[in-house]
Amino acid sequence: MAKHQSVLLHESIKGLAIKADGIYFDGTFGRGGHSREILNHLSDKGRLFAIDKDLDAVQYAKDYFGLDKRFQIFHGSFAQIKEFASQAGVIGAVDGILLDLGVSSPQLDNPERGFSFMLQGPLDMRMDLTQSINAANFVNEAEVNELAHVFRAYGEERFAGRIAKAIVDARKLKPITTTLELAEIVKEANPKWEKHKHPATRVFQAIRIHVNQELTDLSNCLEQCLDVLGPRGRLAVISFHSLEDRIVKQFMRDKEQGNRPPVEVPIKYEELKTNFKRVGKAVKPQSSEIKENVRSRSAVLRIGEKLA
């Protein structure tokens, strides 16, 4: 089992520009790599609130961070960040929010969670085990057109239709219940394998995103972040594939541009009302980090700041 390593750790902490007495949110606690580093930069007056969908992560936080009075964990999605900030009484006063998107190494490496096409396990893929719909429900019950749409939209899978049909044909014989069963069906249906990429990679990503509503949650969270942050509060987001990064990039660009009037209205750029700016360029891992942790290779960090 791979040791969990926080990706772009130092770069994201630097991007948050942490104030010793500040208030921070780690929207994706995982195994606390980023949270631990944030706490290392805080004084006794500082506060850190963390969120995670995964009850294993929440329990880990309570076991290893529970005695730290500066720290509090919430069970749920980062799409509930405004609700949690309200409960904590810190809306409009938060100095920084960190989001480290996607599946964590402990989830990926545990066969019982069903995220990996390399490990035999139940076809589950739920980040939050308290939710009712899992990957097996979707794979065995969705219509062929819905399967194809999800594979295309969330996996950018070229052969979405062919793979969807193969799944429907296979489940007529018996339900698809394990990860390796599904991976084999996809492998057989995929006529052109990408170099250095397992043929089931895109389909598994698509199902995981769909089951966990990852992109919907991300969009909802980003919209709430500006309400949660205080003036000069920072937002740091680490994404791992183009679909996530596109949403983050577009959000930050739109917020920086502000409320643009119609093109025919004569108004100077500096007169546009905006309360957000992007900070620096997108940051990618250095070759040394990729060598040490191959899962970091596709990571992109984007940072923004609320102005007022």
From Swiss-Prot:
> What is this enzyme's class at the first EC digit?
transferase
Q: Which UniProt keywords apply?
A: Cytoplasm, Methyltransferase, rRNA processing, S-adenosyl-L-methionine, Transferase
A GO molecular function annotation here is:
rRNA (cytosine-N4-)-methyltransferase activity
Locations listed in the record: Cytoplasm
Give me the residues that bind S-adenosyl-L-methionine, please. 32-34, 52, 78, 100, 107
* Catalysed transformations (reactions): cytidine(1402) in 16S rRNA + S-adenosyl-L-methionine = N(4)-methylcytidine(1402) in 16S rRNA + S-adenosyl-L-homocysteine + H(+)
Q: Which InterPro entries match?
A: RsmH, SAM-dep_MeTrfase_MraW_recog, SAM-dependent_MTases_sf
Gene Ontology biological process terms, A to Z = rRNA base methylation
Enumerate the Gene3D superfamilies for this protein.
Putative methyltransferase TM0872, insert domain, Vaccinia Virus protein VP39
Any Gene Ontology CC annotation: cytoplasm
Fetch the Pfam families from UniProt: Methyltransf_5
- Where does the source fall among the domains of life? Bacteria
Q: What is this enzyme's EC? A: 2.1.1.199
What family classification does the UniProt entry report for this protein? Belongs to the methyltransferase superfamily. RsmH family.
What this chain does, per the entry, is described as: Specifically methylates the N4 position of cytidine in position 1402 (C1402) of 16S rRNA.
Q: Please report the name of this protein according to its UniProt entry.
A: Ribosomal RNA small subunit methyltransferase H
Q: Which organism is it from?
A: Legionella pneumophila (strain Corby)
